[in-house]
Amino acid sequence: MARCRHHSGYLADDEAAHGTYVARLPKKHLLPEMRPTCKLGRVPHLPSMNRYSERQGHQQNLRRPRAFGGFLDFLTEGQVLDSLQTVVEQATECVATMKTEAGVPLVDVQDRVEVPNSRHRSRGRPSINTVHRHRARPTLCAGHPNNYPSCSSSMSDSHSSVTAGWLGSRSQDSDLGARGVGSLPPMRDKLLLEKNLKRLLRLESKGKVLNQHCSQRDSLLWDSLGSQSSSQPTREQPLSWFSGLLASTSVTPETSELGLGEQEMIFLKQELNKEIKSLLNQPTSFNLPTYCPLREPHRTLDFLSEHHLFPALQRVVSQAVDKLSHACRHNGFPLFPVTSELSPVFPGNSDLQPSSKASLPTDREARGETCYSPTSASSPKTSHRKSKDRRGSPSNAVQMATRFRLKVTPTEVSNVPIPSSQCMLKSPNSDLKLQKQTTASNHNHIPQPRHGLHLTLPAPGITVEVASCQGQLRGQVQHSLATPCHLHSHFPFPVFSPFLPLGKSFSTSPPTLCPEVSSRAGLEVLEGHLKGRGCFTHHF
């Protein structure tokens, strides 16, 4: 037990470990002999190597236990604290001269006894007067047991023990030193906190100066973003003293425990804050006009109309609607089922495309309809009924509308006798077979390749052919042969004369050839040439 006690080098540790005995204290008659050695800076007590003496001292301590205050008295009377103070001053001087890579002192040492209330902080070793005053009046430092070295420890052991005690946690030494009673300097943690506080105050004052001119302009933006005000220190400023040594990285120690996704989000948020700050520091970014909800839509519409962007937007929307209307699900059913297929209207198109406004009749055409129909085939009652049907059912007119195609090619003169119009009027329901045979024989005797004027109507299986001739008329012809052609050129669905039976063929001879016509104007011109003279064939 004695070996462990002397080997540890700390009487306080031995005192705490062995509660049945008290550490052996030197006798009074040894104190006068030890005083000269104390002046030389040597530790007075040496460990005893005699086991008998150790055993005898141990038994003596068991008989007469002494208080721990006797050891403190020994430290005070033997001026052991003086040597401790010297060691601490040397360590303090070494630490005070240490600097970082940036050239900044690592710690700031303050002599609180010399200048207790002054703002000026002295760096380095305390003055000689302070040291002598402390040595002349040594005081007790009540702290942790490890702060007191044993008499058996050497100079290096005492230095290490003092350093270990000085670098420990906060104790009453700093409080006593703050009141000017103790001789030890304040703890390292307190010094570093004070230095960090001074650095933060300096950064805060610098930030106030920099952000003072921007606080009024970006107050609305920062309030909307929910950020902190410019008077408060930013979160990016580190709160630990070693962050200055590590270039003051903005990543806090808590981020190392977070996941990769959270770290990435924090990094992106910091980058966004930097970008916002850089934009706010630019004076040109605040020259933009303020947003007014009552004025901005008007400006947007003006911009679109000035640059003719409405047709482009309409095309884009139409394409999007087209794609969505034809979109299908995984099972093949349409994504948006539509009962009536109505395509968007494109005005300004000369071609009579499906579901276009150009294919719908107008009042002018309805008025011109009576002018071109001299017979009873298109009476006012009939035209009124047709126009009423057109206006009443716009969806049917849209569905029936299609593209007109006309082709004209000359054919050979036929010698078929032409029946009179009176016979046609008297017997409107003549034999259909005879007329079909006559038409077939006429087609068989054409020596040249036959080309015709084809008028494709929206109803399935309906075709109107107009073939040119140079002779007499073929088939049964009425006086109002031009009426069906005129009606076809104006209406998107076929209109026939009540005197013309379905399935009949009729022909006239136009004077000139007309190319393919796809517009309403072309049909009207063609009608003028074919009026009264032409070959029309209507098939179901």
UniProtKB/Swiss-Prot annotation:
Segments of this protein annotated with the region Disordered: 347-400
GO cellular component: centrosome; cytoplasm
Residues in coiled coil: 79-102
Entry-annotated residues carrying Phosphoserine: 393
Sorted UniProt keywords: Coiled coil, Cytoplasm, Cytoskeleton, Phosphoprotein
Pfam families: DUF4702
Cell compartments where the protein resides: Cytoplasm, Cytoskeleton, Microtubule organizing center, Centrosome
Biased composition (Polar residues): 350-359, 372-381
Keyword Coiled coil included in the entry's annotation: yes
InterPro entries assigned: DUF4702
Keyword Metal-binding: no
Identification of the protein by name: Coiled-coil domain-containing protein 116
